[in-house]
């Protein structure tokens, strides 16, 4: 038996084809990164199954593709969409109140033997928060990739003249940093892209 892997990529617009890169700030490089990673993993002999959990969106402003509960990516790989929060598309900063609902849904889903993965890989702070809850409740090892980090964003924006109240209103920066702290505390493995990210950005976390 090979590995069963579950990726959490919760914000933006995610599908298996014709990625809408650059449509907004939430549908960018991370979207392509996750899709290419999943395709590469699915092609490996030691991997039996790899899935991506993302948000199910019912909104006339976006493609009906994002309202499909299940979508194939490749042989042995697919997308599973779960509804949490309002039906409409939301920017990632507005998803925080609904993440525990998603975690509750996934606990029920992943308790079924046919759905339980060997590893959970969470991408970005929102998924890291959900991944930490799942890892703690189900005992499944967690991998965390931040892609970018809240403390670094906070540092740059404050240095550029921003103020704390603005950062909270626009970016929910404290929620993001708290989620990253939780994910890092529970992660069995943390993946970074560069040595600078590892040494200078993650070093700002406890």
Regions found by a protein language model. Give the residues of each.
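Catalytic cores of nucleotide-sugar-dependent glycosyltransferases that transfer UDP/GDP/TDP-activated
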Residues: 1-206
């Amino acid at each position: 038996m090979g590995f069963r892997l579950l990726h959490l990529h919760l914000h933006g617009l995610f599908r298996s084809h014709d990625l809408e890169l650059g449509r907004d700030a939430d549908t960018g490089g991370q979207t392509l990164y996750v899709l290419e990673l999943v395709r590469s993993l699915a092609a490996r002999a030691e991997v039996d199954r790899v899935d991506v959990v993302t948000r199910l969106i019912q909104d006339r402003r976006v493609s009906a593709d994002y309202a499909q509960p299940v979508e194939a990516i490749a042989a042995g790989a697919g997308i599973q969409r779960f509804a949490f929060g309002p039906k409409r598309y939301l920017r990632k900063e507005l998803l925080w109140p609904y993440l525990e609902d998603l975690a509750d849904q996934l606990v029920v889903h992943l308790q079924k033997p046919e759905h339980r993965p060997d590893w959970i890989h969470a991408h970005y702070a929102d998924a890291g928060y959900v991944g930490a809850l799942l890892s703690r409740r189900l005992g499944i090892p967690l991998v965390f990739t931040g892609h970018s980090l809240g403390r670094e964003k906070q540092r740059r924006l404050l240095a550029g003249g921003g103020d704390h109240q603005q950062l909270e209103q626009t970016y929910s920066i404290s929620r993001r940093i708290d989620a990253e702290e939780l994910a890092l505390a529970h992660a069995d493995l943390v993946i970074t892209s560069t040595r600078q990210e590892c040494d200078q950005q993650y070093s700002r976390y406890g």
